[in-house]
UniProtKB/Swiss-Prot annotation:
Organism: Xestia c-nigrum granulosis virus (XnGV)
Prosegment location in residue numbers: 29-133
Protein name: Viral cathepsin
GO biological process, one term: proteolysis
Cysteine disulfide links: C154-C195, C188-C228, C281-C330
Family (UniProt): Belongs to the peptidase C1 family.
EC number from the UniProt entry: 3.4.22.50
GO molecular function: cysteine-type peptidase activity
Length: 346
C-alpha cells in the first residue's frame, strides 16, 4: 500500500510576534512551506495520489510547471495568512484560467442588455441589522444544509448554488432533507448556459417557468450538457429575491432569519484552501463563482462567514470554507446574490 505524506517536504517556520502594553509576549504561531527543491517528488506523489493521467510527456511537463507555480503560491499564502492553511489538492496542476473555465461558472454577462428578472424581487441589503442577531449561527447545526456535491469540470456552480439554497429552505420549512437535480437546470434552463455558466437568480426564474424542479435520483448529475428530459417536478417556487448586498451586518440578519443565501464571489485565491479563516481573498479576477452562505461566527477574534462550495467534500473543510467577515472578502458584497421562495404547496 502506498502512503502519501506531502508534509515530509514541509518546513515549519516562525510567523509572528505579539506585543502587549508592558510585556513582550511571543506567540507560538507557525506556517508551513513546501520545500521547492523537492517539487519533482511532490509532483510524482500528487500524480499517483489523484490518479492523474496526461496524454504525453509534453503535457506532463507543462502540468509540472503549473504545479510548481501553484506550490509557490501555496507557500506565499501560508506565509501571508495566520488563520488559514493552504495545501496541495487535486487542482494543483491547473492554472487560474483553467479553474475559471472548468470549475466555476458564474456568468455576469447574463445580466447585461435588456434581460430582466420577472419573478425575482429586487432587494437591497443595506444598513445595520435590526433586532437581536446571535453572535454566531450556522444552519448546519439545524441539519438544514445538504451534503456537499461535486460540479466536476462543468461551469455549473450557479446550478449547485441555487439547488443548495432550495434544499436548505425546504428543510427549514418541513424538516425534511431533499436531493434535487442540478443536471435538470444544466439541461433545461434556457436562459442560463449549462456548463458554460449562469446566474442563480436566473436559475430560480427557470424553475418557476418550468413548474418546479425534479429529484436527483430520476435526473442524476453527469457534468456535461445534455438533452432536457421530461421528469416530474416535485418542488415548486412562487418567487425569489435578487439581492443587492451592501452591508455584511444586515446580511447576517438575512441569513439568520430567512435561511442560507446563494452568493457570488471571486474564488481564485481559495483554490488551494484547506482550513481556517482566510483573511486575504481579493476580487482581482472578478466575480466568477456561485456558492451558498450558510453561517457566520468568530474564531480567535476573527469574524468569519461559512460557505458551502461545490468542489466535493475532499476540498477545504469537508467542502466548506470560511472567509473573514466585514471586509468584503472575495467581493461578497455585490448585486448577484439570490434566494428562492418556496410555493405554499412545496
Amino acid at each position: 500500500m502506498l502512503f502519501f505524506n506531502f508534509y515530509k517536504h514541509i518546513m515549519f517556520l516562525p510567523w509572528v510576534f505579539c506585543v502587549a502594553l508592558l510585556t513582550l509576549n511571543v506567540c507560538a504561531v507557525s506556517y508551513i512551506a513546501y520545500d521547492m527543491s523537492n517539487a519533482q517528488e511532490l509532483f510524482n506523489e500528487f500524480v499517483v495520489k489523484y490518479n492523474k493521467v496526461y496524454k504525453d510527456d509534453q503535457e506532463k511537463e507543462a502540468r509540472f510547471e503549473i504545479f510548481k507555480q501553484n506550490l509557490a503560491d501555496i507557500n506565499a499564502r501560508n506565509a501571508l495568512e495566520d488563520s488559514a492553511m493552504f495545501e496541495i489538492n487535486s487542482r494543483a496542476d491547473i492554472s487560474s484560467n483553467e479553474l475559471l473555465q472548468k470549475l466555476t461558472g458564474l456568468k455576469l454577462s447574463l445580466m447585461r442588455g435588456e434581460k430582466k428578472n420577472s419573478f425575482c424581487t429586487p432587494t437591497v441589503i443595506s444598513g445595520d441589522s435590526s433586532g437581536k442577531v446571535p453572535d454566531s449561527f450556522d444552519w448546519r447545526d439545524r441539519n438544514s444544509v445538504t451534503s456537499v456535491k461535486m460540479q466536476k469540470e462543468c461551469g455549473s456552480c450557479w446550478a449547485f448554488s441555487a439547488v443548495a439554497n432550495i434544499e436548505s429552505l425546504y428543510h427549514i420549512k418541513h424538516n425534511v432533507s431533499l436531493d434535487l437535480s442540478e443536471q435538470q437546470l444544466v439541461d433545461c434552463d434556457k436562459v442560463n448556459n449549462g456548463c458554460n455558466g449562469g446566474l442563480m437568480s436566473w436559475a430560480f426564474e427557470g424553475i418557476i417557468r418550468a413548474g418546479g424542479i425534479s429529484y436527483e435520483a430520476p435526473y442524476p448529475y453527469t457534468g456535461v450538457d445534455g438533452v432536457c428530459k421530461n421528469t416530474t417536478r416535485y418542488v415548486q417556487l412562487s418567487g425569489c429575491y435578487a439581492y443587492d448586498l451592501r452591508s455584511e451586518k444586515k446580511l447576517r440578519q438575512v441569513l439568520h432569519e430567512k435561511g442560507p443565501v446563494s452568493v457570488a464571489i471571486d474564488v481564485v485565491d481559495l483554490t488551494n484552501y484547506k482550513s481556517g479563516v482566510a483573511k486575504h481573498c481579493s476580487v482581482d479576477h472578478g466575480l466568477n463563482h456561485g456558492v451558498l452562505l450558510v453561517g457566520y461566527g468568530q474564531e480567535n477574534d476573527v469574524k468569519y462567514w461559512t460557505l458551502k462550495n461545490s468542489w466535493g467534500s475532499d476540498w477545504g473543510e469537508q467542502g466548506f470554507f470560511r472567509i473573514k467577515r466585514d471586509v468584503n472578502s472575495c467581493g461578497i458584497l455585490n448585486q448577484f446574490a439570490a434566494s428562492a421562495i418556496l410555493s405554499s404547496s412545496s
